[in-house]
Amino acid sequence: MMSESNKQQAVNKLTEIVANFTAMISTRMPDDVVDKLKQLKDAETSSMGKIIYHTMFDNMQKAIDLNRPACQDTGEIMFFVKVGSRFPLLGELQSILKQAVEEATVKAPLRHNAVEIFDEVNTGKNTGSGVPWVTWDIVPDGDDAEIEVYMAGGGCTLPGRSKVLMPSEGYEGVVKFVFENISTLAVNACPPVLVGVGIATSVETAAVLSRKAILRPIGSRHPNPKAAELELRLEEGLNRLGIGPQGLTGNSSVMGVHIESAARHPSTIGVAVSTGCWAHRRGTLRVHADLTFENLSHTRSAL
């Protein structure tokens, strides 16, 4: 068991690790996002689309060179944590994440995006009531922590929708719901977007799953072959809309479509859509019990 002084040192160390990682992902896109954007850029045939993709890559390089966020909207910080029950700082992790966000806000710097409901006052720290939002997944007997950080920008959050369908609407209803939302709303979400689809029983379970879907590496597939096929068919169909980069038409509309699902009630089909913009700022950090860590999402970037 750690002494109090050793535990405080460990808390300070992990806070610094998470703060540095959070600041870094505001500046640098994850490897899979950069690779996908390059693929779409190389495949683009419209002159306007080519100009926009060139501007995106110029923007990404300037963000690195100047060590500044790649987009001025650095979002509301969310954490999706998969942590072992024997991780030595499990009890302190919630407060560590909050402190890390406040430190990253100064280091990056991050735009102040936490406004208290009803009071309508910006806290100026990117923390507040229920913020940063943390979703927990406790792994029995594990001693690692896998921390996924997501910056939920305003533009890419606005298209988010959730609905409960009648079972008679079937998977055709799911497809219709996805197309209605992306075709009408994604144009203002800084496309090409990454589309997350959650399918479950209720609006809240589907919504959480849709958000988790956009945290997966681009191009990863659902383990169920039928779901994986639907991911590909949705991606192909949405790209035919020709929304293009920044909504100004082009060959592609989306970077990908990911589906996450849970068993549903026989009488309902809950479906939700979440989107990530082209500057999809998310990162995955694995921290071991001895506080050594692995940067899983940005292997080309050192902390």
Swiss-Prot record:
Entry keyword set: 4Fe-4S, Iron, Iron-sulfur, Lyase, Metal-binding
InterPro entries, sorted: Class-I_Fumarase/Tartrate_DH, Fe-S_hydro-lyase_TtdA-typ_cat
Coiled coil (UniProt feature): none
Induction remark: Induced by tartrate, via TtdR.
Catalytic function, reaction form: (2R,3R)-tartrate = oxaloacetate + H2O
E.C. no: 4.2.1.32
UniProt keyword annotation of DNA-binding present: no
Domain of life the protein comes from: Bacteria
Cofactor: iron-sulfur cluster
Subunit (UniProt): Tetramer of two alpha and two beta subunits.
UniProt record similarity statement: Belongs to the class-I fumarase family.
Name of the protein: L(+)-tartrate dehydratase subunit alpha
Organism listed in the record: Escherichia coli O6:H1 (strain CFT073 / ATCC 700928 / UPEC)
Gene that this polypeptide is encoded by: ttdA
